[in-house]
Amino acid sequence: ALFTQLATGLEFVADRRIGRPLGTFDKPRPDLAEGIASGRALANITLSLKALRDLALRLDPDSAKTQAAFDHAIGLSETLNDPLLDHITDPQAWLKLEILQQAIRATRDTAIAEIGPALGVELGFNSQDGD
């Protein structure tokens, strides 16, 4: 269950916290960013990544590739200077956020490939899988 939560958490950050405001290159949707009123859209992404990294470390302290992938994604999020994600209407800012999204998806793939076998488990069903 915890391994599935790790993968689902990464998917949520990439698809919802980033994907919704990212929209498309031609039509970004910064108004759909989470935590606009509190100014925490980017902070929520960064903190989620740090919490998920801690979970991954507790599941498998020897998961060096996963830890490196998390460190890369967290580093990217910490270099963005757009707390509300409202600068993504600028093409360069949009691309930087898309690069972060890709890094998070790569982190998920790495965690599934490295931590799952170390624990002897496979990715399970989650409530967002649909029918």
Model-inferred region functions:
Residues A1-D131:
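Mature extracytoplasmic or organellar-lumen-exposed domains after removal of signal/transit peptides
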